[in-house]
Regions:
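Conserved binding-pocket/active-site segment within a compact domain
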Residues: 130-134, 147-151, 155-157
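Amphipathic alpha-helical segments within extended alpha-helical solenoids and repeat-rich scaffolds
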Residues: 152, 193-199
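Structural detector for internal amphipathic alpha-helices that build alpha-solenoid repeat scaffolds
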Residues: 1-7, 17, 25-40, 45, ...
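Short terminal alpha-helical segments
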Residues: 13-20
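Short coil/turn segments at helix-helix junctions and helix-capping linkers
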Residues: 115-116, 158-161, 195-196
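HEAT/HEAT-like alpha-solenoid repeats
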Residues: 87, 143-151, 183-190
Length: 213
């Protein structure tokens, strides 16, 4: 078991250094977990860099830390998104899905529709249903909501049942968050019920319909 000693005078700087200087996978995970737990904006660049590392444990801790920091993360992460590192992009998609910032709308739509990883498509579909529309003007929100509705309708026909399941969850969240779309989504779920063959997805559709009554 690795032990990480951190000076209390400036723990953020010390933990950033610990992340950068970690000489084992275990030390890296521990340092990232400790840094993420501080919930300090100064940690955003380092936590973003960790998403590029080939260390899933550290990446999960970084994702959790970035989500906890909320919308303050979005501008930096969008600007520094590594389009050539698939792993980093996949982890970043999970961050955006967890934060719910509509500034990441285009990225989430693209991920939900096109990403080759079912886990990324699933995360993006769930995230699309939980965007914070209050951050947009009414006109912007209406346009974005229509985009999300169309995207989730498409993703609800994905070849992988786990992605379809996530799309149903996304549609339910969208309906509960946007009253004007509730009837449309209810009818869409009714139509999807007639097309779905997977029992677990059918059960999720049924539960969503119950929540929208």
């Amino acid at each position: 078991m690795e032990v990480l000693t951190v000076p209390q005078s400036d723990p953020v700087t010390a933990l950033i250094a610990a992340v950068e200087q970690a000489d084992s996978a275990e030390k890296l995970v521990l340092a990232v977990q400790r840094l993420a737990a501080l919930r300090q904006p100064e940690a955003i660049p380092t936590l973003t860099t960790v998403l590029r590392y080939n260390n899933p444990g550290a990446a999960v801790a970084a994702v959790d830390g970035l989500i906890a920091l909320g919308e303050t993360v979005t501008p930096y992460l969008l600007e520094h998104l590594d389009g050539y590192n698939y792993g980093a992009r996949a982890w970043a998609t999970r961050v955006f899905a967890g934060i719910g910032d509509p500034r990441a709308l285009e990225l989430l739509i693209e991920a939900a529709q096109q990403d080759f990883s079912l886990s990324v498509r699933r995360a993006a579909a769930q995230g699309l249903g939980k965007l914070r529309w209050s951050a947009l003007s009414p006109e912007q929100a209406n346009l974005a909501q229509q985009q999300v509705l169309a995207t989730l309708g498409q993703v609800a026909l994905d070849g992988e049942w786990v992605v379809r399941y996530a799309a149903i969850a996304g549609l339910q969240s969208l309906a509960l968050g946007v009253t004007a779309l509730k009837l449309t989504i209810y009818q869409q779920l009714q139509a999807l019920k007639t097309q779905e063959s997977e029992a677990i997805v059918l059960a999720r559709i049924a539960w969503a319909l119950q929540q929208l009554v």
